[in-house]
Amino acid sequence: MARNHERKKRVRKQIPADVEVTVANNTDGMFEYQSPNKVLTLSMEKYGDEEFVNFEDLRQLKRYLEDFSLVIVDVNSDEYSVIDIARSLRVNRSYEEYFKSILGLSDEEMEEEYDIDLEELDDFILDSTLGEYKVQLEGRIKKTIIERSVALYREGELNDYSKLQALKATRPVDERETFLDYVKG
């Protein structure tokens, strides 16, 4: 029973369908989505492009939000934080990992985050220790870490040999030798 008092259960808030959320393309290229009923269409041409989506439509994008291909970058309401939206969509584990591991926030601080700056992920990739970087290469948002690392390498910003070796290790064995040459083009 003492354990229950130590761990405070996070309550999933009821989010109104009309709450507007800003999502950003977190892929190295174009992101397009059209719902099966053709009610929701998103077209973002490059990394960082943003679109407004109401919470009701956001449910259709759940898998993209979970793997961080799309990121909730702003909640246009003072009543709900990014983690509130993520919890309601049941993609909170990825967002909790981002807030705790990438930004180093506590549970309480995470509750107060109303926006996400995509550049913070790039800063983490460039400034983290090798150990921190390797942990994220195996975490919930590894696809995004790998994709952003490749983009930063192409742009000449990521040149840490140890991180590049860790990045290569994520590839199948037969691709590792030529991976960085292939990425550089």
Placement of each model-derived feature along the sequence:
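Charge/polar-rich, low-complexity and marginally structured segments
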Residues: 98-185
